[in-house]
Amino acid sequence: MNRVLYPGTFDPITKGHGDLVERASRLFDHVIIAVAASPKKNPLFPLEQRVELAREVTKHLPNVEVIGFSSLLAHFAKEQGANVFLRGLRAVSDFEYEFQLANMNRQLAPDVESLFLTPSERYSFISSTLVREIAALGGDISKFVHPVVADALTERFKK
């Protein structure tokens, strides 16, 4: 059984993330969206809410599971029985960092392969950072995130 682990902060999960998960769900037996606590990134949403939003966005995919984690990714992958790390590459500029990460993960978890997918063209420019900035300034984010995520962002920035 191929179990792929798609790690990230998902602050928030975007349509670009959803696109990768949809495609991975057709390629793998089981997809785990691994939502990292990432306290050093000072996320906008708490871990529990990011997990819940990702579950809501992917609930139509029966072979997708969403789990929050705060441990070392290599350890978490072993705990979950994952044999592949999935990473998205939006642009060439993402490659250098992702390549370093893949090599480090290979040292820490040699039995887990890294697989890179590029997003569909219509989502290639979307980033969680840009979505947060647009939402904070009152812009329309409906093209970039699922409605439940848009609602959560709108509510968050009302405060």
From Swiss-Prot:
Pathway: Cofactor biosynthesis; coenzyme A biosynthesis; CoA from (R)-pantothenate: step 4/5. Keywords: ATP-binding, Coenzyme A biosynthesis, Cytoplasm, Magnesium, Nucleotide-binding, Nucleotidyltransferase, Transferase. It comes from the Bacteria. The record marks H17 as: Transition state stabilizer. Its EC number is 2.7.7.3. It catalyses: (R)-4'-phosphopantetheine + ATP + H(+) = 3'-dephospho-CoA + diphosphate. Its cofactor is Mg(2+). GO terms for cellular component: cytoplasm. The keyword Transcription regulation does not apply. ATP binds at T9, F10, H17, G88, L89, R90, E98, Y123, S124, F125, I126, S127, S128, T129. GO terms for molecular function: ATP binding; pantetheine-phosphate adenylyltransferase activity. It is found in: Cytoplasm. GO terms for biological process: coenzyme A biosynthetic process. Reversibly transfers an adenylyl group from ATP to 4'-phosphopantetheine, yielding dephospho-CoA (dPCoA) and pyrophosphate. HAMAP family: PPAT_bact. Belongs to the bacterial CoaD family. Homohexamer. PANTHER family: PHOSPHOPANTETHEINE ADENYLYLTRANSFERASE. This is Phosphopantetheine adenylyltransferase.
